[in-house]
Amino acid sequence: MTVNGLQTNVQLAPARAGVRTGETAVFLHGMGTDSLASFYLTLAPPVAAAGIDVISYDLRGHGKTERPDSGYTIADFVADLHDLLNQLGLTQPVHLVGNSFGGTLAFSYAAAHPDRVRSIVCIESEPATEMWADKMTQILDHTVDFLAREESFDWIEANFSAHHRRLARMAADRIINTSIAQDVPLGPLLSLGEVEGIGCPVLSILGREGYQSDDLEALTSLLPRGELHVFDGQGHSVLVERHREVRELVLTWIARQAA
C-alpha cells in the first residue's frame, strides 16, 4: 500500500477468532539489515494467536518498502507510522513494540501523538535524545567506514554466514547510497523533559551487555510509568536470541494494560 507517498510493505495478522481481545500491536523493526521479518519469525504469529491484532511493516528504505534517496529523519518515520494507522482506520490507541531503532521511533511517535499510543514495549531501545544522537552518529560513521571496505564482507561471511554477507551487502547499499546515515541523528530530538512527559506505560527490555549497559536504569528512571526487564549474559540481539522469553513478556504486558 502507499504510505506517506511511498510504496510500503505491510503485513496484517488478525487476532485468532474466538480469543480476540480488541487490542492492537504494531511492530517496528530496527535499522540497517532489519525488516519486518525479524518480528514475523519471532513474535507476530504467537501474539496474533493470543487474540491481538498485529500490524508489521517495513520501514522506509528497508525490506520491500520503497527506498527514496533522502528523507530519513525521525520526523519522516513518525509521519509514515501516523499515515499508516490513519489509513487502516486505527484511531484507538495501539501498543507499539519496537526493536532497536523501532523503539526509538515508538518514543518519538508517542511524544508527537500521545492519544494514539496505549503502551510501548522497547527492546534494546532508547528515545532520540542528544545522547542518543551522539551515539548514533558514531555507530553510523563506523558502519559506513566498515561497509565501504570489500574485506569487511569476507570477514562477515567467515565469522557468521553467507546469508549475513548478503544482508550486509543490502545494508551497505542502503546506508552508503541514501542519506539515512546523515538524516537519522538529526531527529528531531526529544528533550529530557519531553521524555519525562511520555505518559503511557513503557516496558524496556534490555540485555545486560547491550547498548545501554553503562546505565541500565537511565531510561526507566525518567519515565513516569516505566518498567525494566534485563536479560543477564545478553547483548543487543535480544529479540532474536531470547524471542521466547520476549514473547511471554509482551503477551503478559499487553494483557496487563488491557485489564
At which residue positions do the language-model features occur?
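Conserved HGGG/HGGXW glycine-rich cap/lid loop of the alpha/beta-hydrolase fold
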Residues: 6-64
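Glycine-rich His-Gly loop
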Residues: 27-31, 100, 207
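Active-site loop/oxyanion-hole signature of alpha/beta-hydrolase fold enzymes
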Residues: 49, 53-97, 248
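Gly/Ala-rich beta-loop-alpha elbow adjacent to hydrolase catalytic centers
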Residues: 98, 102, 106
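Flexible "cap/lid" loop of the alpha/beta hydrolase fold
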Residues: 107-111, 118-148
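Hydrophobic, aromatic-rich cap/lid helix
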Residues: 164-194, 208-209
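Conserved loop-alpha-helix segment in the C-terminal half of the alpha/beta-hydrolase fold
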Residues: 202-234
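Catalytic histidine-centered segment of alpha/beta-hydrolase-like enzymes
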Residues: 234-243, 247
